Amino acid sequence: MAQNGSEGPLLAGVAGRYALALYELARDEGQVDDVAKNLDAFDALYRESADLRRLVKSPAFSAEEQTAAVGALLDRAGISGLAANFIKLSAANRRLFALPDMIRAYREKVREAKGIVRAEVRVAEKPSDAVIEDIKASLRDVAKSEVDIDLHIDPSLIGGIVVKMGSRMVDASLRTKLNSIRLAMREAR
């Protein structure tokens, strides 16, 4: 398996084993994209709900309590099929704490299977859709492959862009340039 970017090692541990099993089942059933969509929906709920994060991370809840609570949430959210069964199985096996990593590992496996390279892009403020497409096109030219962008807004960059793709990183942020100038000025004294 590819060790692509910072998510590569996820495919080696518990998260990777669960994600690989889910991916293989989804592939065999022709449901890879449906499962990804449902996992993304659950991941969005997870990021938005402090109560769900507490349920997932806390060892104080029994497997039965976690399974029941997650089952009710999945029903309300309309998450069903293989993804729902996978999430419930994770709860029943006391592996719910690893679910965020399992979801990331599943995404990585899907990208790998489709030949898509992941790029983490940090900018100071949200760019327009046209700028995002220009960034994607530039990264596609470099990677010689389709690129999936994870966009992060980081006002501390002041301006510019930081791109991490695989083991390569380009920092063209204004913050880094100002720090370089500051360092050069200190050395010139």
UniProtKB/Swiss-Prot annotation:
GO molecular function: proton-transporting ATP synthase activity, rotational mechanism
Alphabetical keyword list: ATP synthesis, Cell inner membrane, Cell membrane, CF(1), Hydrogen ion transport, Ion transport, Membrane, Transport
Keyword check for Plastid: no
Disulfide bonds: none
KW Ion transport (keyword) present: yes
Location(s) in or outside the cell: Cell inner membrane
PROSITE patterns (UniProt xref): ATPASE_DELTA
Pfam families per the UniProt record, alphabetical: OSCP
Highest taxon in the source lineage: Bacteria
GO cellular component: plasma membrane; proton-transporting ATP synthase complex
Membrane-topology annotation of the record: Peripheral membrane protein
Function summary: F(1)F(0) ATP synthase produces ATP from ADP in the presence of a proton or sodium gradient. F-type ATPases consist of two structural domains, F(1) containing the extramembraneous catalytic core and F(0) containing the membrane proton channel, linked together by a central stalk and a peripheral stalk. During catalysis, ATP synthesis in the catalytic domain of F(1) is coupled via a rotary mechanism of the central stalk subunits to proton translocation. This protein is part of the stalk that links CF(0) to CF(1). It either transmits conformational changes from CF(0) to CF(1) or is implicated in proton conduction.
HAMAP family attached to this UniProt entry: ATP_synth_delta_bact (MF_01416)
Quaternary data: F-type ATPases have 2 components, F(1) - the catalytic core - and F(0) - the membrane proton channel. F(1) has five subunits: alpha(3), beta(3), gamma(1), delta(1), epsilon(1). F(0) has three main subunits: a(1), b(2) and c(10-14). The alpha and beta chains form an alternating ring which encloses part of the gamma chain. F(1) is attached to F(0) by a central stalk formed by the gamma and epsilon chains, while a peripheral stalk is formed by the delta and b chains.
Family classification: Belongs to the ATPase delta chain family.
Protein name (database record): ATP synthase subunit delta
Gene: atpH
